[in-house]
């Protein structure tokens, strides 16, 4: 095959085929992409490895358009979370309700009274935007908000216990994802760790014996991401608060996931509530906004007015504070808790957590034939019972009854691993990536969180081409 002459960059730029790309991406981006593309094709064209049609204006503009679309595609992608873990840290944790999304849009689009008191016309406090709701819902005297619960714990410790000892049970020295360890956080906060008791048993006398002139606070941490069972003992919040207050010390309780309602009402495992911790005497309570609360990422610090005041004066507070979008979403989510009877209908996270297994199974039965057709005869598609998780460290041993589509390759066991990896990759390559979990030589798609059934079905025909 003889060599083919490449069109010039200028000719391509002025072509009708490139006009939409110029309009959408701008001249500079289009110019750079066309130059790169022509540079790659110059050698094959010289050696006759390309046909004339492959170098037409329409074809080259099309290839440039594909590259530009990939370059300009958002790195933030919507996905289907079919892992069975509702509050999946890697997939964004809590899904916000419509009320919160509308509040974020309003706050993003218009000026608002973030730190402006409309009554007095003077500078305000951004925490006041949710303070009234928090007092109403929890009975806390005061509140401040930072960007996550790790920041809340760090700020509270530094404000109340810097250069002093923090007394905590050895069984509560937790580690969560991302290298968050209570001993390390205490050290960063300037608090000297004084651990008491043993891994499985800590008594009131252990705390009493540890208190001395260097003591700054007592700390209690809810071990939400693991469970110690068997021969165990711990000191309840009320008793620990009495010990702390008897020595003039504050009690800081970190609830981790945190919830404002009794989850057993919806058939979910019991989690300690913020109200219970405060009623039992905790002076400061910290918890997350984007876990069981069902809101945006945030760390809430509630409790004694004087102690919250000290925390708010800490210079670290400004470094850790939240923005207007977070506060707008948080206020909207908290507002839903005023009507607990409709909470499971309106709060997305609670609705998904409490979704009946029978409803999920019926959905799986509807979807199985379409998925089987998309995968072809090389795959077995079965509807099976499944056990999901709350996620994000909440109730680690509890399971949520669910249903899943179990996808198993009809191949010898030694070949299944590669087939499953290819299927995982193909599902991730769909326009709306599908994320499942591997278990027992199969890929499981737990449907608890599949809200948009039409969108899931619409892209299944592409699956076979992705696998080929």
Swiss-Prot record:
What's in the GO CC field?
cytoplasm
Give the cofactors, semicolon-separated: pyridoxal 5'-phosphate
Give the UniProt family note.
Answer: Belongs to the SelA family.
Give the N6-(pyridoxal phosphate)lysine positions (modified residues).
Answer: 291
Tell me the gene name: selA
Any one Gene Ontology biological process term? conversion of seryl-tRNAsec to selenocys-tRNAsec
Q: Which SUPFAM superfamilies match?
A: PLP-dependent transferases
The identity of this protein, by name, is L-seryl-tRNA(Sec) selenium transferase
Its annotated compartments are: Cytoplasm
Major location category of this protein: cytoplasm
Mind telling me which InterPro entries this protein's record contains?
A: PyrdxlP-dep_Trfase, PyrdxlP-dep_Trfase_major, SelA-like, SelA_trans, SelA_trans_N_dom
Q: What does this protein do?
A: Converts seryl-tRNA(Sec) to selenocysteinyl-tRNA(Sec) required for selenoprotein biosynthesis.
EC nos: 2.9.1.1
Give the keywords, sorted.
Answer: Cytoplasm, Protein biosynthesis, Pyridoxal phosphate, Selenium, Transferase
Mention one GO molecular function.
L-seryl-tRNA(Sec) selenium transferase activity
Pathway-wise, it operates in:
Aminoacyl-tRNA biosynthesis; selenocysteinyl-tRNA(Sec) biosynthesis; selenocysteinyl-tRNA(Sec) from L-seryl-tRNA(Sec) (bacterial route): step 1/1
The protein's matches in NCBIfam families, at most eight in alphabetical order, are given as: selA (TIGR00474)
Q: Which reaction does it catalyse?
A: L-seryl-tRNA(Sec) + selenophosphate + H(+) = L-selenocysteinyl-tRNA(Sec) + phosphate
